[in-house]
Amino acid sequence: MIDKQFEKEEFKKSVKENVKFLYRKTLEEATQEQIFQAVSYTVKDVIIDNWLKSQKAYEKQDPKIVYYMSMEFLMGRALGNNLINLGAYGEVKEALEELGLDINCIEDQEPDPALGNGGLGRLAACFLDSLATLNYCAYGCGIRYRYGMFKQEIRDGYQVEAPDNWLKNGYPFELRRPEYAKEVHFGGYVRVEWDPVKNENKFIHEGYQAVKAVPYDMPITGYNNDVVNTLRIWDAEPIVDFNLDSFDKGDYHNAVEQENLARTIVEVLYPNDNHMAGKELRLKQQYFFVSASLQAAIAKYKKTHDDITKLHEKVVFQMNDTHPTVAVAELMRILIDEEGLGWDQAWDITTKCCAYTNHTIMSEALEKWPIELFSRLLPRVYQIIEEINRRFILEIQQKYPGNFEKIKKMAIIYDGQVKMAHLAIVAGYSVNGVARLHTEILKNQELKDFYEMMPEKFNNKTNGITQRRFLAHGNPLLADWVTDKIGPDWITDLSQLSKLKVYADDEKALQEFMTIKFKNKERLAKYILEHNGVEVDPHSIFDIQVKRLHEYKRQLLNILHVIYLYNQIKAHPEMDFYPRTFIFGAKASAAYARAKKIIKLINCVADVVNNDASINGKLKVVFIENYRVSNAEIIFAAADVSEQISTASKEASGTGNMKFMLNGAPTLGTMDGANVEIVQEVGEENAFIFGMSSDQIINYENNGGYDPDFIYNTDPEIRQVLMQLINGTFSSDTEMFRDIYNSLLDKRNMPRPDQYFILGDFRSYAEAQKRVEATYKDEKRWAKMALLNTACSGKFTSDRTIQEYVDDIWHLDKVIVKKN
């Protein structure tokens, strides 16, 4: 394993000893889960050697460190990924086989760490992988959620949220670090007293509730370079564990009250915020991990540096979306109240340390907090934001005298709310979007006033994915084929994939490529049969949409089109129709009623379609339960068609589109997010583009003129599909999908009916689907298209994205960890 010559016998001995010492069992007596733990601890031993070596190298070379602060880190399983990065996957597989063990069965015992939900968290995970692989010193900073967002179960077609108890057996790839615990303070009040020495007011936070933040460190291995960075996730514990006096008096509730209050902070990701208690808990979570992370970063800096005013030379805090943006004010608080700096000096440091990534143009996702809540929960931090806001308004007035509209649009505090994105933009030295189109929309639409005032801050960093997880680990058959054709350098230089273009007209290579695709489809079909009880034909077109469930992502457009196809087959049973399998995977937020109803609709349509013998299996619909990284790897490898059908202008980037492309699935999509750049790389002839442009959508939104009612009244096939939502075709309860029907047509629907232009794009989408079918029937043409998607995906590696962050924003130096 990289550091020391891998000895199979030594590895096997270590696994057996771990089983004995951990469980007092022999290997033959141990359960699969116990064997997973034993194997993981054996691998972790090697990782820890490299981890220590990396820390020594960092201490010696004193590099600038990026702290990547994110509410989510969707890591996926660690065992297989670490083995690939250590260069030991094949050897460990052989060693386990010699012990009579199957590495795939062992990997399946590992829970997906429930530290994230969607693209935001998976991007953060890919970035950590690339930072380590590219030899940069980085810490991920987040929360150690006990139950994640939720484990999705489908019961009677409905999403049911269950706790995702990923820690129930302990997690071998983490280390508790109580020696680095920090205190985080909530509530209380601020007392002001005069400091005669400094001749200024001194602010003292008193009467607060204190919570202990205890870090757990996870190793992040670089590929084939011995670098191990750290993901530090914070657990919340009470300052005093247990009130024995209360317990002895029979007051059992009070005995554990402090523990319960602390634990609540880290129970779940994104607690329901439809009520004030939920809003307060979310703000608590955000401040909790940000404050602990900043305290830890500054303590680490001060161990080897005396001058706090040079913090920005060695530290950068990258705020991943608006969740961690309270970091701006918390850093100011630490520098002023704890380090004794004046306002101007603290502001100068803060504005050189903090950078902000915007991930959305959806206004509801640009967080705003009620002043009453914020000032009560974080009184000193709120005072600092008030002062930042006061000074910023003066800047606006100087630049735009008398323009009160500018103040209204740009103020950090306005109309009873604290606007976190505005705080991040004002204080951050860099503001980046995550795809070219997204960044242009930010500059010209959503954040136009800020861009006009401070254009130098704005830049684009198109997202990327790590090929080490989503090809090397997720699709080993294709990975081996690629290596056989062009060598292994693609694992750290994805631009090498362009060398595959020479095989685009090579019939033998195309046949090999499609044989691998078919084997991966068989693997997914087996998974579906085991988990859904539905038999799907791997010879059919696997048309897949897997992503967070949101109306703008338009899973509804997809399932309405499935209904349309079903109607076509029923009306014309003799028609030449190539068999299709439509596969969905998505979690809906627990409080998002319409999104959950769309899941129910998909499952109701599946029940009808899959059980209709008259269509001879030409059409199948599958909803994969509990979509997550571990089943995503199986899904991406098996896809024929990548559904990327968001309303143009709404998707910031997307990264699922890149994972599908890397695995040889052409994009069926709108010109939105990173789809635009995918088409630029692969050519429009190797994708299936449909729908209105972002300019057309924005024009309709700003000026009106879109009339879904007209479409409904003039297109009988669309009308039939919509009527089937409410006439009992898919549910005996004709009101079951009334809300979905009304959302598309009822003029009382706010802000307008069919907010995401589903009916407006329906015909264009249906035509694109016809092109998919026609192309797929031409086997050679389809194979060439699929191969070219893989060959042209080199741009979309997170290695490229991270290098752009390093060059343009972070300015880090590489650190070399010497191999033994």
Regions found by a protein language model. Give the residues of each.
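A conserved ligand/cofactor-binding region detector
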Residues: 1-820
